[in-house]
Curated annotation (Swiss-Prot):
Statement: the UniProt record of this protein carries the keyword Chloroplast: yes
Swiss-Prot/TrEMBL catalytic activity: a plastoquinone + NADH + (n+1) H(+)(in) = a plastoquinol + NAD(+) + n H(+)(out); a plastoquinone + NADPH + (n+1) H(+)(in) = a plastoquinol + NADP(+) + n H(+)(out)
Organism: Dampiera diversifolia
Purpose: NDH shuttles electrons from NAD(P)H:plastoquinone, via FMN and iron-sulfur (Fe-S) centers, to quinones in the photosynthetic chain and possibly in a chloroplast respiratory chain. The immediate electron acceptor for the enzyme in this species is believed to be plastoquinone. Couples the redox reaction to proton translocation, and thus conserves the redox energy in a proton gradient.
GO CC, one annotated term: chloroplast thylakoid membrane
Record GO terms (molecular function): NADH dehydrogenase (ubiquinone) activity; quinone binding
Residue stretches spanning the membrane: 9-29, 40-60, 88-108, 125-145, 147-167, 185-205, 219-239, 258-278, 290-312, 327-347, 354-374, 396-416, 425-445, 548-568, 608-628, 724-744
InterPro entries, per the entry: NADH_UbQ_OxRdtase_chlpt_su5_C (IPR002128), NADHpl_OxRdtase_5_subgr (IPR018393), ND/Mrp_TM (IPR001750), NU5C-like (IPR003945), Proton_antipo_N (IPR001516)
Keyword Chloroplast: yes
Topology with respect to the bilayer: Multi-pass membrane protein
UniProt name for this protein: NAD(P)H-quinone oxidoreductase subunit 5, chloroplastic
Similarity-based family: Belongs to the complex I subunit 5 family.
């Protein structure tokens, strides 16, 4: 077994040759390298698969033996300072390694087709492989110095991937925003690392925790300084995991390609912050004020993220705020000391969110042939709807991820989220009420995203994409916006776009659909987009290719079954809770009791309330977002409640307030823009003025003064040597007299 652990160093380094070789190939042999691009993609997936198999082998050994292995090499050794590099294989490392590799393989396989027509295909795979390498290096690090090095590499990769389409101004601004926001957290992390080294004299986790706990228990260190250093360490996690108030970069990060969003939100960028808190939890747990602060940030973030997701029109931004909220649950759990619950939710959320993002990518991919390649249109849920009949596999997978995130049993997130909710009652009733209320909001906005995207009729048919700013036949109701009425006649004519299968073959068929001349004239300005130069014109979205659907289906299976990893179950004295056995060494390090989990019956009984709240959120979403065009009738159930009156006006005000809150991002971004961005620019202008006029002005002024004095003397001398000599001797005599009187 120890021989297997000795090769743990290959985990971060095995995927590294691919980005290096791609970079060298593009520099030295660009044409040949691009011609072999599918081979490089295969190599990326292959090497990451080897790491996944190796990580699974290590995990099985850890479950059976509850072992921890660390290997270090001494790099710098002297009397005052020593630095070691190595790797640490413990349950947290193996869990994160499996998470990164499995999600990474699915995303890379998906990206082969998704990015196939992009000129930056090879650059994309180089960035993605290096991203996985950096994250694997982070989770295997054995000390704080390595953590910081790979932490910065992860940030650099996210900057490159978010700004992958750097020619688009929005993408360029988004990657800069992510970079600058994370600079704040990274600077705090660096100061915290230096402060902890000042206290303990070590960067190694194995020594650091023992020394730190000993100093705290013996009261041999300034508690205020210790708390401040721990707070600085937590600042790094706040920025990386998009926690309040450094969450502003996350929705803008959606400007990158969708596979990047899936990897960032599931297993790399945002997971790095959760990993850091979990890794340093033995340090945080002995400082009660820090634990309380961590839980406070978590509860604020989970509620804020849920409210911001309520009225988003962009499908990816809605999922981004969902990620922010779910990360808040994990931070809350870690702040409460629920180590197992936090990691369990990290696992289940990763697969569910990767499924949702890849599903949204499939939807966006299919919508692009209708509305063009502008993200403002292809990602707009107001232009979707009615996709069930066109993308049934994607719809089923997306529904699976939606129900999982809503907390519906027996899907993955149900088991992990309910553990956090149950633990929150024991920690703080106020926090518990907020967390449970947010569970209902989660079910509402996730169901809203699903309904707007897949149910009803294709709303793109009701918009004019001819390039002229004509009034659309019907405005699309999302929230806070009124839909204009259309006549029943026009509506029925537009419904003819939904052609009978007996009259029209599939859009994959070579035969075109024969439409009535009147209908053809109506839809001509709407839909006239050919797909990638093909002579065939697509009038409807289409299902993605198998290379994109296969990863979605695999992630769907993970979403179905990964929750059974941590189900609390004790059958005839045999503990079937695999996750608890896996985490035994880490839980023992935290001095927590490993036998605190409920049995399956008690857990199911406690979960009734949370499932009821989630069901209520789903019901409200169905009630509010039931498709208006659900039949050939203009009136349906919701229209019975839309008559004008005092209650209607009041409800409109509430909806408008929620819409404004969500669309303006809780007014936090405008606040930062007004008081920070503008303030920093004014400060920069002030310092520039001080530097140019004061700092540079003093030596320049002295030089000018000397110049004018010299010019004056020159004019007095008249250009004659005798005059210059007279002035020289007279001034010399004057200074000699002064010197004489001062010394005698």
């Amino acid at each position: 077994m120890e021989q297997t652990y000795q090769y743990g160093w290959i985990i971060p380094f095995l995927p590294l040759p691919v980005p290096m070789l791609i970079g060298l190939g593009l520099l030295l042999f660009p044409t040949a390298t691009k011609s072999l691009r599918r081979m490089w993609a295969f190599q990326s997936v292959l090497l990451l698969s080897i790491v996944m198999i190796f990580s699974m082998n290590l995990s099985i050994q850890q479950i059976n033996s509850s072992s921890v292995y660390q290997y270090v090499w001494s790099w710098i050794i002297n009397n005052d300072f020593s630095l070691e590099f190595g790797y640490l294989i413990d349950p947290l490392t193996s869990i994160m390694s499996i998470l990164i590799t499995t999600v990474g393989i699915m995303v890379l396989s998906y990206s082969d087709n998704y990015m196939s027509h992009d000129h930056g295909y090879l650059r994309f795979f180089a960035y993605m492989s290096f991203f996985s390498t950096s994250m694997l290096g982070l989770v295997t690090s054995s000390n704080l110095i390595q953590i910081y090095i790979f932490w910065e590499l992860v940030g650099m990769c996210s900057y490159l991937l978010i700004g992958f389409w750097f020619t688009r101004p929005l993408a360029a601004n988004a990657c800069q925003k992510a970079f600058v926001t994370n600079r704040v957290g990274d600077f705090g992390l660096l100061l915290g690392i230096l402060g902890i080294y000042w206290i303990t004299g070590s960067f190694e986790f194995r020594d650091l925790f023992q020394i730190f706990n000993s100093l705290i228990s013996n009261n041999e260190v300034n508690f205020l300084f210790v708390t401040f250093c721990a707070l600085l360490l937590f600042t790094g996690a706040i920025a990386k995991s998009a926690q309040f108030p450094l969450h502003v970069w996350l929705p803008d990060a959606m400007e990158g390609p969708t596979p990047i969003s899936a990897l960032i939100h599931a297993a790399t960028m945002v997971a790095a912050g959760i990993f850091l808190i979990a890794r340093l939890l033995p340090l945080f747990i002995v400082i009660p004020h820090i634990m309380n602060f961590i839980s406070l940030i978590g509860i604020i973030t989970l509620f804020l993220g849920a409210t911001l997701a309520l009225a988003q029109k962009d499908i990816k931004r809605g999922l981004a705020y969902s990620t922010m909220s779910q990360l808040g649950y994990m931070v809350l759990a870690l702040g409460m000391g629920s180590y197992r619950s936090a990691l369990f939710h990290l696992i289940t959320h990763a697969y569910s969110k990767a499924l949702l993002f890849l599903g949204s990518g499939s939807v966006i991919h299919s919508m692009e042939t209708l509305v063009g390649y502008s993200p403002q249109k292809s990602q707009n849920m107001g232009l979707m709807g009615g996709l069930t009949k066109h993308v049934p596999i994607t719809k089923t997978a997306f529904l699976l991820g939606t129900l999982s995130l809503c907390g519906i049993p027996p899907l993955a997130c149900f088991w992990s989220k309910d553990e956090i909710l149950n633990d929150s009652w024991l920690y703080s009733p106020i926090f518990a009420i907020i967390a449970w209320s947010t569970a209902g909001l989660t079910a509402f906005y996730m169901c809203r995203i699903y309904l707007l995207s897949f149910e009803g009729h294709l709303n793109a048919h009701f918009q004019n994409y001819s390039g002229k700013k004509n009034t659309p036949l019907s405005s699309i109701y999302i929230w806070g916006k009124e839909a204009s009425e259309i006549s029943k006649k026009n509506f029925c004519e537009l419904i003819l776009l939904k052609m009978k299968r007996t009259e029209c073959p599939s859009f994959f068929s070579k035969k075109g659909c024969k439409l009535d001349e009147k209908v053809r004239n109506m839809i001509q300005p709407f839909l006239s987009i050919s797909y990638l130069g093909n002579n065939k014109t697509y009038f409807y979205p289409y299902e993605s290719d198998n290379t994109m659907l296969f990863p979605i289906l695999i992630l769907g299976l993970f979403t179905l079954f990964i929750g059974f990893l941590g189900i609390p179950s004790n059958h005839e004295g045999v503990d079937l809770d695999i996750l608890s056995k896996w985490l035994t060494p880490s839980i023992n390090l935290l001095h927590q009791n490993t036998n605190t989990s409920l049995d399956l019956y008690e857990f199911s009984k406690d979960s009734i309330f949370s499932v009821s709240i989630a069901s209520l959120g789903i019901f409200i979403a169905f009630f509010l977002y039931k498709p208006v065009y659900s039949s050939f009738q203009i009136l349906d159930l919701i229209n019975l409640f839309v008559k004008r009156g005092p209650k209607r006006i009041f409800s409109d005000k509430i909806k408008k307030g929620i819409y404004d809150w969500s669309s303006n991002r809780a007014y936090i971004d405008p606040f930062y823009t007004t008081f920070l961005t503008v303030g920093m620019r004014k400060l920069a202008e002030l310092t520039h003025f001080f530097d140019r006029r004061i700092i540079d002005g003093i030596p320049n002024g002295v030089g000018l003064m000397i110049f004018f004095v010299a010019e004056g003397i020159k004019s007095l001398g008249g250009g004659r040597i005798s005059s210059y000599l007279f002035f020289y001797l007279s001034h010399l005599s004057f200074f000699l007299l002064i010197y004489y009187f001062l010394n005698f």
